[in-house]
Structures are given as C-alpha cells and as structure tokens.
Amino acid sequence: MSQLLVRPHEPDATGCVLEVTPQSAGWAHVGFKVCRLAPRQELTGGEADRETCIVVLNGSAHISINDVALGLVGGRSSVFDDVAPGAVYVPAGARFLVVAETGLEVALCSAPGRPGRPARIIAPEAMSREVRGQRTNTRYVRNILPQTEAADSLLVVEVLTPGGHWSSYPPHKHDNAVLGQETRLEETYYHRLNPSQGFAFQRVYTDDGDLDETLCVKDGDVVLVPRGYHPVGAPHGYDLYYLNVMAGPERKWIFRNDPAHEWMLLKR
C-alpha cells in the first residue's frame, strides 16, 4: 500500500480508529487523529508544545479545557449535513476532556504551538461557507480555522464535493516558500463517502515526476500530501467529504496552480 495512504482500523480502548503523527508521516508539523466514542465515553489529550483543533464531525460532546467546562459542542448527524461542525481551539500547554453525549466521531487536528492563547469554542457563524469552482468543478467549503482566526500553526477546513465533480482543482500545490507567491504547508485529507461503499481518486504529483501516485480512496481513509499537486475526483453517485489539516513554517495558505492546467481558470 502507498505510504501516502492511511486506512482506519477497529477502535482501540480510547476509541481511536486512525492516527497520523509527524513521526509516522515523516514530516514536521501536522498531526491528525480520529476517534469514535460511545455515549458517556471519555477522551483526553493535550500537549505542551502543540495546539489542537477538536472538530466534532458528528454527534455532540461536553468539552472541558483545564477543568473548565465549555459546554455541549456539536450536534450534526452527519458530515454530509450542510451545517457547521462543532469545534474547539485548544492552545499548547492545555489539557482537554471530551465526554460523548451521543455516539460521536471526533477529529483531533494538531500542529506546533506556544502556550498562552485562550481556549475557545469556534462559533458556527465564524466558519465562513463558500462555493468554489463552477459546473463539474463546484464544491462547498467551510472554513473551520482559517488564517484570519487566531492560532499558531493550524489551518483547518472541510469540503463537500458532489458526486461527479472534482475538487482541489485545477491542481495546486503549496510545498515551496516563495514570498507572496507560495507557502510551504503539509496537508492531510480525511475522506468520507456517501454512500459509504463508494470510492474516490486522489492524485499526488510533483513537477519533476519524482512523486506521482494516484490513490483509490475509501470511506475513512487519510491521504498525506507532503508535497506536490493533489487534485481529487468523486465518481458519479458518491458524494465526497474531506477534512483538511494544514500547517507549516508560515501560517498562510498561498498556493500555486499547475501551469499546465491553469488555462481553464481563464476560460469562463
């Protein structure tokens, strides 16, 4: 199996079904973990030198930071609902406790950080929704933790791509630091499909061809994007959801399109 593809496993004692660490991915910044909890099951975490964005993918949970209760977070029944997820920002140096109110799927998105920022619930109205692309390139984006919102390293966004459409397209990359033109960001894609027996395709490739892999993605898979362009295609009949986590030396999302395919942006 490709080293860029991480598949889920049965829940362990903590409910974890999938985990990506900087060590397992072979990079320096992004961490990602998915847990599925039964009602009243607890999940704890927090790191001295890493910030975390808790994203309640579906279900609801009571969340506390350093023993301070933030309240009930979440509530949507599926990632395919067109509503914002529940989300909480946890600064580096803080501890969190998640107690499932219902059956729960939660993502823990992490990256390097410094202690001192306040913990907070990310309000649904703060998560801007936008429509990108047109015709069979149309997809629906919700910015959970964009660069306009306070954090040290993390960028978090979710995207719904209708069946038969493309996403992260035309192909773009963000693997080189060029002032004002491109930033260097690692990225994970957490994929869900509806219906769940479906599949999607994601290609990860570089200009020089040193990296060029096309991956068949199933429900619950993660694709690692250490570098290169990374377009996604959803077959007819299967809607695709993905949660992106990005982080790098600079907290800005500035990308460069593949010049071979940039022409289509000029053709309206």
Protein language model regions, located:
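Double-stranded beta-helix
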Residues: 104-143, 205, 243-268
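Extended, compositionally biased flexible segments
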Residues: 31-99
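Acidic/histidine-enriched, beta-strand-rich ligand/metal-binding domains
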Residues: 192, 197-268
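Glycine- and acidic-residue-biased ligand/ion/polar-headgroup-sensing regions
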Residues: 48-71, 75, 163, 175-221, ...
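Conserved metal-binding segment of the jelly-roll/cupin
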Residues: 81-101, 111, 216-237
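A short glycine-rich, His/Asp/Glu-containing loop-to-beta-strand
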Residues: 11-44, 51, 137-188
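Conserved hydrophobic/aromatic beta-strand scaffold that supports enzyme active sites
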Residues: 32-36, 53, 87-89, 108, ...
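Short, structured patches in soluble enzyme cores that scaffold and shape functional sites
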Residues: 92, 100, 108-112, 145, ...
